[in-house]
Design a protein with these regions (language model features):
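Acidic, low-complexity mobile loops and tails
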Residues: 1-55, 88, 92-126
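Conserved hydrophobic positions within beta-strands
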Residues: 12, 59, 68, 73-76
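Short, solvent-exposed beta-edge and connector elements
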Residues: 35-40, 62, 71-73
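Short, conserved catalytic or interaction motifs in soluble domains
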Residues: 61-64, 81
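Conserved protein kinase catalytic core
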Residues: 66, 84, 110
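Short peripheral tails and domain-boundary helices/loops at the edges of structured domains
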Residues: 73-89, 93
Length: 126
């Protein structure tokens, strides 16, 4: 993945600007590794409003359940249908086929305020 248009949160979500007002959201490889084998993902419905820093779903792994937080506010425009049958895609390809949702962003400033890759890697000690 080209990380030029990607930002990160302290909660280990990544947000990729897809052009226009759309962003894709997933979790980082660091988060996927910490969670372990992911067995189920609950996502918001298309058309649902999400609010930055609020839970928008859950990620169930063999050893834990974690909230999925919205890194930006907006409206869900797509969900990854493959995760229903293959939640393990999050572990296998967290920056690619393991994406969670696409959101039409309400305020681009929220995206701009997130960490770049260097800041995120520094936060996780890499």
């Amino acid at each position: 993945m080209d990380f030029k248009n990607v930002r990160f949160t302290k909660d280990h979500e990544w947000v990729r600007a897809d052009g226009g007002e759309e962003v894709s959201i997933g979790i980082t490889d660091f988060a996927a590794g910490e969670l372990g084998d992911i067995v189920y993902v609950e996502l918001p419905k298309v058309g649902a409003a999400v609010t930055a820093h609020q839970s928008m779903g859950t990620i169930e792994a063999v050893k834990t359940v974690a909230d999925l937080f919205a890194p930006v506010s907006g409206v869900v425009s797509a969900i990854n249908p493959a995760l229903e049958q293959h939640p393990d895609l999050v572990n296998q390809d967290p920056f690619g086929d393991g994406w969670f949702v696409r959101v039409k962003v309400k305020d681009k400033k929220e995206f701009d305020a997130l960490m770049d890759r260097a800041a995120y890697q520094s936060m996780i000690g890499k």
